[in-house]
C-alpha cells in the first residue's frame, strides 16, 4: 500500500493533475484544501478566522457555518480527485472519515489562543478535533473493492458530530494502524528548507537542529514524520507541483525522514 498526503497548497497551486496522473493502484490518498475553503467561505459571506496558538501554530476556527463550508469544499475536492482517477481507468472511491466511521476524533472542548492584543486566552474549541483512530477493517474493505481510496479530513466524534481534523493526523494514524512502511507528503516546496534550500535527509541525529529552521505547517509535518520514524515508517516530504511527484518522492527526490 502506498500512503500519500496531498496538501492543499498543491491543489490550489494547480498541481492536482500532476498528482492524479501519478497515482497507482494500491494507494490511499488523504487530501487537504484549506485555501479553497477560504474562497467558499467568502462567497457564503462567512469570514475565515485563523487562530494563533502559544506553540506558534495556527488553525482554522470552525464554528457551525465554517463547518458547513469546510465539509462542502472537502467533499468537492474529494470527488474531483475521484473523477480524475476514474477517467484514467483507476477504480477510485472517495469518502470522508465520517463515512462508515472510518476516522474517529475527539472534539477539542477548549483551545488556547493568543488574541489580537497578544493575550493568552482559552476559548471554546468549536467543531475541530484530534484524530483518535482509524477503522482498519473498513479501510481494508475499501482497498479490496477498489484500486484507490481517497479520504477527506472530516472525522466522526463519539457524539456523532462531524469534526474538522488535520489530514496529517489521519495519515499518521493510517500509517501506524496499517503498518505502512512509507508515507509521501506532498506540498508546494521541494522538501524541508534550511536557509531557503531543501535538505536531503532528516535523522534522529540532526532533527533538533533542523526543527529550529521550520515553522507552521512544515514544522508540524516534520514532527509527525519524526514520530513515525520511531515506528519504522520512512516519510518523504516532497514537491507535489513537479512532474510525477509520487514516483519522484518514492525515489528519494525530496526530504527523506528516517
UniProtKB/Swiss-Prot annotation:
Entry keywords, A to Z: Amino-acid biosynthesis, Arginine biosynthesis, ATP-binding, Cytoplasm, Kinase, Lysine biosynthesis, Nucleotide-binding, Transferase
Predominant subcellular localization, coarse grouping: cytoplasm
Superkingdom of the source species: Archaea
UniProt cross-references to InterPro entries, sorted A to Z: AceGlu_kinase-like_sf, AcgluKinase_fam, Asp/Glu/Uridylate_kinase, LysZ
Keyword Transit peptide listed: no
Catalytic activity: [amino-group carrier protein]-C-terminal-N-(1,4-dicarboxybutan-1-yl)-L-glutamine + ATP = [amino-group carrier protein]-C-terminal-N-(1-carboxy-5-phosphooxy-5-oxopentan-1-yl)-L-glutamine + ADP; [amino-group carrier protein]-C-terminal-gamma-(L-glutamyl)-L-glutamate + ATP = [amino-group carrier protein]-C-terminal-gamma-(5-phospho-L-glutamyl)-L-glutamate + ADP
Annotated Gene Ontology cellular component terms: cytoplasm
Protein name: Putative [LysW]-aminoadipate/[LysW]-glutamate kinase
Gene source species: Caldivirga maquilingensis (strain ATCC 700844 / DSM 13496 / JCM 10307 / IC-167)
Lineage: Archaea, Thermoproteota, Thermoprotei, Thermoproteales, Thermoproteaceae
Gene assigned in the entry: lysZ
Amino acid at each position: 500500500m502506498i500512503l500519500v498526503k496531498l496538501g492543499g497548497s498543491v491543489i490550489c497551486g494547480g498541481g492536482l493533475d500532476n498528482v492524479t496522473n501519478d497515482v497507482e493502484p494500491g494507494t490511499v490518498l488523504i487530501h487537504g484544501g484549506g485555501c479553497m475553503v477560504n474562497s467558499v467561505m467568502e462567497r457564503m459571506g462567512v469570514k475565515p478566522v485563523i487562530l494563533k496558538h502559544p506553540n506558534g501554530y495556527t488553525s482554522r476556527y470552525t464554528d457551525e457555518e465554517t463547518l458547513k463550508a469546510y465539509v462542502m469544499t472537502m467533499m468537492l475536492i474529494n470527488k474531483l480527485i475521484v473523477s480524475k482517477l476514474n477517467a484514467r481507468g483507476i477504480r477510485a472511491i472517495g469518502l470522508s472519515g465520517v463515512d462508515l466511521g472510518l476516522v474517529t476524533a475527539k472534539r477539542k472542548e477548549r483551545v488556547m489562543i493568543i488574541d489580537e492584543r497578544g493575550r493568552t486566552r482559552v476559548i471554546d474549541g468549536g467543531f475541530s478535533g484530534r484524530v483518535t483512530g482509524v477503522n482498519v477493517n473498513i479501510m481494508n474493505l475499501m482497498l479490496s473493492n477498489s484500486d484507490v481510496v481517497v479520504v477527506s479530513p472530516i472525522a466522526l466524534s463519539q457524539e456523532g458530530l462531524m469534526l474538522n481534523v488535520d489530514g496529517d493526523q489521519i495519515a499518521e494514524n493510517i500509517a501506524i494502524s496499517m503498518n505502512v512502511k512509507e508515507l509521501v507528503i506532498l506540498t508546494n516546496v521541494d522538501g524541508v528548507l534550511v536557509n531557503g534550500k531543501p535538505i536531503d535527509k532528516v535523522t534522529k541525529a540532526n532533527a533538533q537542529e533542523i526543527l529550529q529552521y521550520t515553522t507552521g505547517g512544515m514544522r508540524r509535518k516534520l514532527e509527525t514524520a519524526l514520530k513515525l520514524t520511531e515506528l519504522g515508517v520512512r516519510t518523504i516530504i516532497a514537491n507535489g507541483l513537479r512532474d510525477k511527484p509520487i514516483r519522484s518522492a518514492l525515489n528519494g527526490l525530496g526530504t527523506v525522514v528516517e
